[in-house]
Amino acid sequence: MFNWNDYGNGIYGFDSGYVRPLLAAIHLIVEGSRCAIIDTGSNDSVDNIVAALHKVGLSEDAVDYVILTHIHLDHAGGAGLLMQKCPNAKLVVHPRGARHMAEPSKLIEGVSAVYGAEYVQKVYGKIMPIAAERIIEAPDNTIISLNKRELLCIDTPGHARHHICIIDKQTSSIFTGDMFGLSYRELDVNGKAFI
């Protein structure tokens, strides 16, 4: 597991392991014996998510929600595989992303057009569909109750039109996914972002 952080109040975070360290994070919110997972990374991240659950004393059966900030594959590519391992979980996703998680062929086609099919297969593996009845669409101001702990989903288009942020009302913590466009430290010039 990469860069494990216990933030207190049942909030844990760790690196997804996607491409390089500190590029994308996965979070657990634990309330009593129940858990919500925010973002999944790619299929390669799923074993680390399961290990994280076990680290906090929970099994895959304890997961009530897998919440995606958006459906880009660095944040959502492992959702289908994770949902197979978490039989009680519902997937929470922006309404614009829900159909792509139930039937990911157009999503895979679009990513393959940008990066190439070989790269997509190598980095993301097989993207698994999620049964529509396990998907909860989360338009602006949707409240998800995790063992009576309220998680507010807010529509935050910008990085993607299908992007949400999640506010844990108990701690006032916000889980932002990707809030900006692309910016990589390798492209910094004189200590400032080039793009």
Can you describe what each PLM-predicted range is?
Residues F2-V56, I166-T176:
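Conserved beta-strand hairpin/beta-sheet module of binuclear metal-dependent hydrolase folds
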